[in-house]
Amino acid sequence: SSSLSLETKDKDKIVMTYCNLVNKLKTLKKEIYVVEVCEGDYFLREVAEKTNTKLIPIDTPIIAAGKILANARAFVSGRYHPAILASLGGTPCVFMASNSHKTKSLQELLKYENVVEYPVLPSDEEIMSIVQDTSIVIQGGDETRDKIRNRAKELCDNAQTISELIK
């Protein structure tokens, strides 16, 4: 991803960091999938292989990918558009930084109580915080999912009124 390339060119460091993140997330005893969103995420294939984790590849049809994300227990990512797809189904996200304000703004739009963006290459301590935050949002269950889903629907409904305003 462009955020990673700004952070480091060291592919081994990137793969090692994400392997560590995936392995720590596995301690939550939930099924983990690695989601390859764009060509810049190709390194995630190696992460999936090294951690023995299922991969949702870049060529997954958008409707299928959206359904997977919308029904996930949680989504850890710095990717804006997949986070929107996840949010439409109420999936809580734990956000990593991107090279723009978008993921922070999305959290604010969806009225997240704790607006946080973790670094794209998190330290061991930050990985533990990501895992803890992921555990918390999963424990929020249907209440958290309903809150996110309802807010996403409200925003969607509001967006439809824009066409009336600009006629």
Question: What kind of region is each of these model predictions?
Answer:
Residues 1-167:
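Active-site anion-handling motifs in enzyme catalytic cores
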